[in-house]
Regions:
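Extended hydrophobic leader/signal-anchor segments used for secretion and membrane insertion
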Residues: 1-105
C-alpha cells in the first residue's frame, strides 16, 4: 500500500509530503517504521517507529517528540493494530533520509 506523510512527528527520517511503500502484515522488528491504526480513531493511520513489543502490543514512538500535534504510545499506550512495515520512501526522488531512515539493515 502507499501512504503519504503528514506532520512533523517523524522528522528527520520522514517529512511532510514523503510517499511510502508499506508492506501489509510484514514482520516488525524494533527500530522499524510502521503504519498503524490510531487508537480511538481506527479510520486514521499513523506512521511511527516500533520500539518494543510487549504483552499488550507494540510501543510506537515519534522520532520528533517536540512536534506539534504529535501522538504516539506515550499518549495512548501499546498498539495492537499494526497495518504494515514501511519498506521504502519512494517520493520525492533524490532526498536522502535521516540517520534513522527507512532502510532496513
Amino acid at each position: 500500500m502507499r501512504v503519504r506523510v503528514e506532520g512533523d512527528s517523524m522528522r528527520p527520517a520522514l517529512v511532510p509530503g514523503d510517499w511510502l511503500l508499506v508492506r501489509r502484515g510484514a514482520a516488525v522488528r524494533p527500530g522499524d517504521l510502521v503504519v498503524a491504526r490510531l487508537p480511538g480513531d481506527p479510520d486514521r493511520l499513523i506512521v511511527k517507529r516500533a520500539q518494543w513489543h510487549g504483552a499488550d502490543g507494540w510501543w510506537l514512538e515519534s522520532d520528533n517528540q517536540r512536534a506539534g500535534g504529535r501522538r504516539d504510545s506515550w499518549d495512548f499506550g501499546p498498539v495492537e493494530d499494526i497495518v504494515g512495515r514501511v519498506v521504502l520512501r519512494y517520493w520525492p526522488l533524490g532526498r536522502r533520509h535521516g540517520k534513522r531512515g527507512v532502510k532496513r539493515g
